[in-house]
Amino acid sequence: TLVDSMIHDGLWDVYNDIHMGNTGEVVSEEFSISREGMDAFAAQSQQRAATAQAEGWFDWEMIPVQVPQRRSDPVTVDADEGVRGDTTEESLARLPPVFDREGKVTAGNASTLNDGAAAVLVADADLAAEMGWDIIAEIVDQTTSGVAPERVMAAPIPAVRTLLERQGLDVLDVDVYEHNEAFAAASCAVAQDLGIPNDRFNLHGGAVSLGHPLGASGARCLITMIGAMRRIDAKSGIVTLCLGGGNAVAMLVRRS
């Protein structure tokens, strides 16, 4: 028997014996997220990412990779290949649901499965100064949260709320937010429940457009957020993402 290791190891809720896509349906129902709202968010993600690519806003965070070819010169990959700036709400509306025949999650409003890698270097400020490293942001605080496994897509909400409360902050005290767009339904729920304005949320697109390479998305989201902060000269940002099993993490960073 052939087993898809991506689904078996990374995309299956072993507690409820369901695909992670079904948890996108769960969060859409719990927070009354419409299919139209999900498609609108997904189209926005594609368009924001396409703009960021065209304007070179991703360049500082990307490392070009040479890919050997069997019978030709190596190919240089220096941009995420899944971004589709011509995506519209109308084109997304034509796609059928994937995980539930009566559901709302489609291939267009879910994150794409991508190969990718990301890394960050975390260091003591004194060591960074000694080594001559540029400090791009300071970690202020971080939190974790846990909910029922089938509600995993909602787990970032208590993580962010705890982080704000612990720091004595209101939502609008933070300049930029970055949420891993595992499903558009999840991002819509997080922004809606926390009251995050659209012009502070996932400014350069997210996993719906850029992809969700499992294990790399945490670092990728953090750096993409810092890139957006650099572009608009924002001073503070919160990045958050859910984890299999019903957990989530959130981190507050600050630029000087």
Task: Give the residues covered by each predicted segment.
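Flexible glycine-/small-residue-enriched beta->alpha junction loops
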Residues: 1-26, 31
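Condensing-enzyme catalytic core mediating Claisen C-C bond formation in acyl metabolism
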Residues: 2, 7, 29, 87-154, ...
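Active-site pocket-lining segment
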Residues: 22-25, 61, 69-71, 140-209
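Cysteine-centered functional microenvironments
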Residues: 27-34, 39-41, 102-112, 143, ...
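Active-site-proximal alpha-helical scaffold in enzymes
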Residues: 28-57, 119-126, 213-234, 252-253
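N-terminal extracellular/periplasmic Venus flytrap/periplasmic-binding protein-like
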Residues: 37-130, 193, 198-200
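Short acidic, glycine/serine/threonine-rich loops at helix termini
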Residues: 77, 150-152, 213-214, 248-253
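Internal helix-turn-beta structural module
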Residues: 171, 188-193, 197-202, 207-250
